[in-house]
Amino acid sequence: MTNKLLDALAQAETVAITGHVNPDGDCVGSCMGMYLYLKENYPGIRADVYLKDVRESFSYIEDLDKARERFELGDKYDLLLLFDVSSRDRICVSQEILHSCARSVCVDHHVTNPGLGEENVIVPEASSTCEVLFGLLEEEKISKAAAEALYTGIAHDTGMFHHSCTSGKTMRIAGTLMEKGIDFTRIADVSFYTKTYRQNQIMGRTILESIMLLDGKCIVGVVSQRVMEFYGVTPKDLDGIVDQLRVTRGVEVAIFLYAVGTQEYKVSMRSNGGVDVSAVAQSFGGGGHVRAAGCTM
């Protein structure tokens, strides 16, 4: 069976790796998992990771401090690896990176991904991009450090193995990564459950000021630029709010909007199963999954 990722790597000497804006655990985990795998198994390849606005809670991932936040025009690579990116406008750091690489491979699990790379490995039924990536790598060559990154992505996109996207295959892969000796308890505590006081404050305020619509079937929370400035937070501090809104009894859809610019809002949507929020997001130029999607308005 053809492995598009490994086939492309066999012909590359320089590789750029990137994910999506406001990178979550799956994005960070897949990008860094790939970087660490290359570092450990492809000494002849020079690889650079491009990620911006990464949450401090992921700092335990090895070499994350080497990620670049800016793409310099003029930089050239043999291969671009795109992870967890469903559309061109969601590419982290700069879209110019698309034009600076001779080839590109996109690895993703978003059903709305049109095929962003020249070669694509898109598996919508997978729990996460990290699950897809695991299937493309040689298991025995995955180190403990790379396993930590991959486990992080799977754990986050499954909501610590709670969401319906979790399958038996997902659990078997997670078990394999655990057997590499990773501290899975620490990963959960540090990157998923632990919140700063300010994060708890703004989550509490958002829930307090949220409104119920459609006879309680839809809940909406909003964070304005003014409120973000008041609490001294940035978009990366808002992780988890939409999921907390979703678990409200009787709610079928949760919508969370937060300011990202003047008269511009990022919209995150979650469904408890009866509504395909990816279809809603697509109508506004966004995308995602049936139960988790987003767009910018």
Regions inferred by a protein language model and the residue ranges of each:
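Hydrophobic helix-and-loop "lid/oligomerization" segment in the mid-to-C-terminal part
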Residues: 3-19, 29-59, 69, 73-79, ...
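Generic enzyme active-site microenvironment
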Residues: 18, 22, 82, 106-107, ...
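Short glycine-rich anion-binding loops that position phosphate/pyrophosphate groups of nucleotides
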Residues: 21-23, 85-88, 110-112, 225-226, ...
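Short glycine/serine/threonine-rich phosphate/pyrophosphate-binding segments
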Residues: 25-31, 88-92
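A glycine- and small-aliphatic-rich helix-loop capping segment at beta-alpha/alpha-beta transitions
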Residues: 40, 97-104, 138-139, 168
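Active-site cofactor/cluster-binding pocket
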Residues: 62-64, 68-119
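Solvent-exposed alpha-helices and their adjacent loops that cap or buttress functional pockets
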Residues: 72-75, 96-99, 113-114, 142-144, ...
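Short alpha-helices
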Residues: 109-173
